[in-house]
Swiss-Prot record:
Pfam families: ATP-synt_A
Superkingdom of source: Bacteria
Family: Belongs to the ATPase A chain family.
GO MF entry, a single one: proton-transporting ATP synthase activity, rotational mechanism
Protein's name in the database: ATP synthase subunit a
Quaternary context: F-type ATPases have 2 components, CF(1) - the catalytic core - and CF(0) - the membrane proton channel. CF(1) has five subunits: alpha(3), beta(3), gamma(1), delta(1), epsilon(1). CF(0) has three main subunits: a(1), b(2) and c(9-12). The alpha and beta chains form an alternating ring which encloses part of the gamma chain. CF(1) is attached to CF(0) by a central stalk formed by the gamma and epsilon chains, while a peripheral stalk is formed by the delta and b chains.
Localization per Swiss-Prot or TrEMBL: Cell inner membrane
Bilayer-spanning residue ranges: 25-45, 85-105, 115-135, 144-164, 193-213, 216-236
């Protein structure tokens, strides 16, 4: 194999080393692609909203489809009460989607293939949703951990399970995204290495697999952004509408 498939996930510094005390806050390739993803989102929606016409341009159509898609996802999952949080969900979905998609470009860096990035995103969502829950319901939000209709003898055990399940949300949310992106890109690199190693004659089969895997990985990149956003909507729904 030409190169180690894990080298693509290496974070390296761009420019001078910058430290805040003992903490290294240098600009890295991960930082670069987060900035690129954010700027690309701003550029597309800025161009898409410049001229609102009955016959939309490609950028306007993309902007409107994205807006409608996320708006419907929020309505179907969290209801009308979640509408004030549209910008929050929309920003998360688009950021994860663009980070995933930029990772499909050769020699680009997949930001979401690092657990620290996905865990910080998931933790931010977890803390934000928890704050919203307590702001809306006060201490009544704790009823989320007490399901109705549970026999008194089982209640202590069920409450413990519910608390553990709740606290594990940022872990499951972050690991799901990180694991899928890392696994997919590793497989693509492995098959790409086979193509190079086997040459023109023997490389046709792994090349075919590599092309098919690339198409699948593009689909996975979108689906993982969708799953990340829709789970955020579900958590927000729990905070806004106590079903227990």
């Amino acid at each position: 194999m030409a190169t180690n498939p894990m080298n693509q996930f290496e974070v390296y510094r761009i420019g001078p080393e910058i430290k805040l005390g003992a903490i290294d806050i240098s600009f890295t390739n991960a930082s670069l692609f987060m900035v690129i993803s954010s700027l690309a989102i701003l550029l597309i929606f800025n161009l898409g909203s410049k001229k609102n016409s009955l016959l939309p341009s490609k950028m306007q159509l993309l902007s409107e489809l994205s807006y409608t898609f996320v708006s419907k996802m929020i309505s179907d999952t969290a209801g009308s009460k979640a509408k004030p949080y549209f910008a929050f969900i929309f920003s998360i979905f688009m950021f994860v989607l663009f980070c995933n998609m930029f990772g499909m470009i050769p020699y680009a860096f997949t930001v979401t293939s690092h657990i620290i990035v996905t865990f910080i995103l998931a933790s931010f969502i977890f803390v934000g949703v928890t704050i919203i829950g307590f702001m809306k319901h006060g201490l009544g939000y704790l009823k989320l951990f007490v399901p109705s209709g549970v026999p008194a003898v089982l209640l202590p055990l069920i409450v413990v399970i519910e608390i553990i399940s709740y606290l594990s949300r940022p872990v499951s949310l972050s690991v799901r995204l990180f694991a899928n992106m890392m696994a997919g890109h590793t497989m693509m690199k492995v098959f790409g290495g086979f193509v190079i190693s086997l040459g023109i004659v023997g490389g046709w089969l792994p090349l075919s697999f590599s092309v098919a895997l690339t198409g699948l990985e593009i689909l996975v990149a979108f689906l993982q952004a969708y799953v990340f956003a829709i789970l955020t909507c579900i958590y927000l729904n729990d905070a806004l509408n106590l079903h227990h």
